[in-house]
Amino acid sequence: MRSRVLVLLAAFALAGCMAAPDPSRPGVLTVGLREPATLLPADVTDQAGRLVTSALWTPLADYDAASGKLTPRAASSITSADRVHWTVKLAPGRFHDGTPVTAQSYVDTWAAVAAEHWASSAVLTNLLRAKEITAADPSTISITLDRPSGQVPALLSAPGLVPLPASVLASHDWNGFARAPVGNGPFRLNGAWQPGSGGTLQRDDGRGVTQIDLKVGDPAAQYDAVKAGTLDVATEVPGSRHESVDADFAGRHATWALPRAGYLVFPVADGRFSDATVRHGFALGVDRSALEAGALDHQAEPAKALLPPADAPGERTGTCRPCSFDAAAGKALLAQVAFPGGATVYFGPGTETWARPLTVGLHKSLDVSVTAQGKPATNALDGPSTLDVKLATPSPYELLSALATASGYADDVFRENLAAADAAATPDEAGQLYRLAENQLLRDLPVAPIWSAHGHAVWSARAHGVTTTPFAGITLAAITL
């Protein structure tokens, strides 16, 4: 009798393991993501943080780097007659606490961003460079620059420049606000964010899904949950699932360019790397495809240009020569200038995982002694260093100027082209000048492009209308069930 009971219990247990998941709740979307580093929008640099804050906030505008097209969002218009004096007209809007979004909201928020030195502060201090920002009236922001610039629409579309409510601007309780953020976007956070667990987004305008349950977890487990039908969207595809995604989710997965890229920066002031021939030799010795499949875990593409797709003014034809892997040519270039051999590649925070295998690859392909070492607290390096750039805006000016600064590259023609692109009257004119500046960097090669990051998501059969953008990732407000 006892054995029959055990058999029955085992049968029931097996049936429970094999049972289909509970039916999904109507109107509720479930989304898996990593733990965001912060939900303070001006300090967000990670993909998970941008996904959440892009649902909680609406930026002034969307800017497409490839076409130069500006789509007003929280602003009704962004205009200038001389590219020095800019006027931003706001569309009517409210924060989730019911208070109005005004021009003063932006003025005070931007002052706080600059004062707190958050990740997006450089957009204001280094790129916008305004002499004065004022609220002309409750719905009008007036900006006066220190020079003519046509890049203002691209800069003001930065997701880190969204407004904060008066309550936190008065209290300065930034940590508390990051746990329970209040934005001006289509979704509000229902309660506080629960670290390690997630949170619930609520939409009250009657459009799209009314509720999104955000679930923090492991990307591989989330991928498998979508496949099993217990999760609607997984916002990251780990390398271990890369090869099976087409078979598992035919027509229900997407990749998109992220505003992030990796570079090898050369110390152009150092005698051994002052010759561009040496720098080109090292660039040709990098097996980018091996890095992509190995250390980068299929989360990036081998670089094809200096400007990554998320930041480029249109598509570049073909792969740039320094982006190619040609070990024989690289060795020949080093032999041509009698490179003495022996080099250290320095890595900073967050780049060691790919810097070490890159160094091993250079040693093998170029047949010179190359070692990896943590970057010391000095600007005077005697070897190349790895650089992981996380962009705050879709303007190429941000990246090109940052790369020149990182390498110590100083050239009058490059500076003139960059300044002319910044001042250009139209996106087309600016794009041509940015390409000239990019081509010059590819010729002189103070930095070698290594990889550009991409996002990759999968979704269940009941999710529809999934679209993506470089900075927000998946547009949660566009999904329907």
Model-assigned labels for residue ranges:
Residues 269-311, 354, 441-446:
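Periplasmic-binding protein-like
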Residues 32-82, 111, 182:
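N-terminal lobe/hinge region of extracytoplasmic solute-binding protein
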Residues 151-211:
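Gly/Pro-rich hinge or "lid" segments in bacterial periplasmic/extracellular proteins
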Residues 195-244:
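Ligand-site clamp/hinge motif
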